[in-house]
Each structure stands twice: as structure tokens, then as C-alpha cells.
Amino acid sequence: TDLMMGNFFRVTCPYLFELDTVAYFPLLRGRHSFDAVARIRDTTQLLLDVYSGEDDIYLHPLKVWNRYSGQMFLPHHFSKKDGQFRPVEGGVGMSRYYQLLQNLSLNHPDQNYDSYDRFFNLAKMEYTRGIFSEDTEEQIIDSTMTKDERLKKLVRQYFTPDDYFLLRNRMIGSGAIGGKACGMVLARKICETEIPEFTGHNEPHDSFYIGSDVFYTYIVSNDCWRLRIRQRTKEGYFSAAGELRDHLLTGQFPANIREQFLNMLEYYGQSPIIVRSSSFLEDGFGNAFAGKYESVFCVNQGSPQERLEKFEQAVRQVYASTMNYSALEYRYQRGLDTRDEQMAILVQRVSGSGYGNYFMPGAAGVGYSYSTYKWMPDMDSSAGMLRIVMGLGTKAVDRTSEDYPRLSNQDRPTATIYSTTEQKHRYSQRNIDVLDCTENCARELPLNQLLPVLPLWYKKLLLEHDRDAEMLLQQRGIYRNVWFVSCQGLLSNSGFTGLMQRILHTLEKVYHNPVDIEYTVNMDETGDFVVNLLQCRPLYTSKKSKQVDFSKIEWDDIFFDIKDSSM
């Protein structure tokens, strides 16, 4: 792509200069954008434009470093008699030269386009004529979606050419969209195709994708390439990571990339968005990278310039998270430390509604197509399980010491592990993650602080009364409602739980592997709901697992004895 070609020259030309050597690189006319050529002009010492007609060859110096003469930047004509280039000065000679330029420009009218865009435009033109070759599809999947053979097979099965073109239209830069984005769009296509009722309850997405080439462009344009190479050595893998992380947090984006960021933010207006990691290796078969890379909420309030600065800092945070110690260790332990890990980014509109000054989804969480957490002997693990919370789904993904998500096994969705109201209240979600539109930040609120802005119908779906606690208060002359989060009303909606079970079952069947998903659900007072499928990845399953006979263990050697439960 033009972005990566520009990066090549930005890295190579200074290196050749240090080596005190000379190298010539030919560029084919009309194959690259004006922007790409401008990046090369900025870094090279010498840039020559060469034109050839039937009998004439012209050379036009566009940049000559540290040298100047009165005729240097004139076009020069090649003489076949003596093999010399001489300046074109006469009126006749200049008219022939400009006629040649005009003829050549007619053959290359689209130099405002990236070479990658021209490839897609050509594929689109062929498709309108009823042609879409397997080679073209293979190129698109390889360069944009995934190189994993199992995922490629699924993409070919469920994607149409229109899907590829739509995805490209929503890309910033070029390169791959990464594992998380690929998993999200693929899961949606599978559900749209295989589950008839999915479309009626599916919340459409309007995500953008920052291509993986932008990650390398950011590194190169901030003069971090050699540091990146040093960090990828055995000696520098951990030791150079902190320095590279600091540089990634403080770099600047090229002007053409910033302009595309601004166009995207204008599209979203002041709707909150989330900037999510979507690396090459993320969310593929065998490597989930769960929680290793960052996702950053942008509440997206303020002036366009303020929103752009917040967004750029969020992208920097995601890029820098590739150098987090936990991510480096994860890659090292799995033998991925020598693999090229590039970071693409998935930008999604935050699903939800406004409640006073706060914004959040009705509920959110994660789902597993196979549940290893079985608290009743007759539960069906293959029915799947949901971890569901009120507000943003971070409480379902990131474990906290005070908050407990609601667990729902999908064969008995309303069943709970606790038998008393006191237990249900004690082991419930106490704090809600929301976006504060006044303070322009994500924050955690105690449930009681959020209650005044919640409508009654919403409370009935997500909350329960603690009648025992209310009675104790009444005995002391205190009359007030005591609420706690249970999601019982939502889980009593068989339409919702039935759809979630079908989504999990269908994805596992198509993937030929257990999966986990991230989702949000928004409801209204009529009981209608929409589900937003945010992520899907294959669950890692160990090949070394086996049945263990516990009867041979001596009683004195047992620390914990648990039956029909999980720990």
C-alpha cells in the first residue's frame, strides 16, 4: 500500500545516507497517490521525473539536495547523438514537452487515490459487470481481514463483495482491520444468515476501522522505527519496551491521518465512542489476548478540536498497550514474541441511552457458548452462560472485589446460585460504570446515586426490591425503597434469553469451537429489545485435558471438597 511504501522510504533513505552509499528506486507513474510521492520527496535527496514518448526521453529534477544551478530545475531532453541531457528552453521544445505531459496525464487521472483504493475501485467496477474473481477475493481477505485459514474459509462463506466494499469505505488508512474487528463483523454476518429472528432484534453497527498500516506509519513518522527493531530482539524484548511505550504515548499523527480522524468524528457528532484494540494476533484461534490490550471510552463532548485531541490520545493509549508488560509476557509465553504484532483499531459507537447526564447501555456483558461454571447438578453446560451487568460492560469483563455480575445459565436463565434475598443483595453489582456527559469522562457510580434518573420500567427490568431490608428499616421508622441489581426482569424475557442461546449455539456450530462474545442489550417500556454483538472469539481449549480419578486421593491430602459446584 502507499502508506507502507512511504514508510519504507522514510526508514531506508536516512539509513543509506548514514552508510554513505547511493541507491536508485524506480516508481511507476500513476501507481501511487500524490500524498505518497510527497512523503518520498520529503525524505529522499534526489527526486527525478522521467517521461518518455515514442522518440523522446525527458528528465525533470523535482528535488536536488544541497545543489543548485540556474537551469537545474528545468526539464532536460536526452540526445541520442552524444548521450547527454540538455535543458529544454526553446518554445518548440517546451511545447513538445508539455504535449507529452498532457498525453500521459490522460492515462493516469486518479493520482489523488491510494494504490489500495484503486485496487478496490477496480474490483468494484468488475463486480458491477458481473465479475468477481477468486483471486480478487483472496487478495481482499488476505490484506484486509485475516490470514488465518479457518477464519478465511468462514469469511468466504458468509461475506458478499458488497460487504468487502462497505468495510473498505469505513477504513482509515490501509492494511488489516485486526482480529477483534474481523471477529465482530464475521459473527454478525453468521447470525444474520443463520438466525431468522436476529435481524429484528439486531442493533446495526456503524463502526470504523483504523488499518494496521497506520500503526507502522505512526511509529515511522515519530522516528521510533529503530527503537521498534531493538525492542523486537531477544535482548531488547522487555528492556526496550518501556522506552518505546513512552514514545508511543507522546507521538504525533501525520496530517492526512488526522484529517481522516476528524472526518470520522464529524460523522459521529457528539455520540460517545469507544476506541478498541484489534491487533493481528488478537481474538484468533488459540490466542484470545483477553484483557491484554486497552480499550478507551471517548465521551465525545466539547469542541471539534477537543474531541480530536481526546480521540488521538485514546489511539495512542491503545498503541502503547502493545508494550504493556502483561501483553509482552503473554506473547513470550506462547512463543509469539518473534511474530509481527501490528495494532489495528476498531472504533465503535457506544450503544445505549441517556439517563440524566449519564449515558450507558441498558445492560451489557459477556456470553460463553459452553459453561464450565455449573452450580446445579442438572444444568446443561452446552446451553451456554451469560455474565450480565447494568450499565457499561466493563464490570462483566474486569473482575472487581465489590461487584458481582449476574450469572445466567441459558437452559435455566432465571435460576440463581443464591437462595435468600439477603444473599442475592450481598453478591450483586453495587457500582455502575457510566459515561458522564457533563464531566466528559467514564466513571463509576454507586447504584443509589443513579436511581433518581432511572425510569420505573427500567428499574423493574434490572433491579429488585430487598423486602427484608425494607421491613427492617420500617421497624425503625424509615420508609424507603431498597434496590439491588439482579437483571431478573430482563432474564425473565424468554425472547431475549432464547435469542442469546441461539446466537451462542450458532456461532459455536459454525466455528466448530466454543466461543465467547461481548454484547449490549437495550430495552424499552414495551418489553422490546435490541442486541448489539460487539465481539466474538474462539475460546481456547487445552488439548492436554483428561478425566481425573479423585477416589485415589487420601482424605488427609484434601484442602477443599466441592460437589455440584465450581470454584
Q: Which residues make up each language-model segment?
A:
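Short, surface-exposed amphipathic charged segments that create phosphate/polyanion-binding patches used
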Residues: 60-67, 219-226, 288-292, 361-365
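A conserved helix-loop-beta module that forms one wall/lid of the active-site cleft
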Residues: 164-230, 234-255
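C-terminal regions of RecA-like/P-loop NTPase motor modules
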Residues: 67-107
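Conserved mixed alpha/beta core segments that line enzyme active sites in large multi-domain catalysts
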Residues: 30, 151-153, 158-197, 252-567
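Short, basic, glycine/proline-bearing loop/turn elements
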Residues: 21-25, 241-249, 481-493
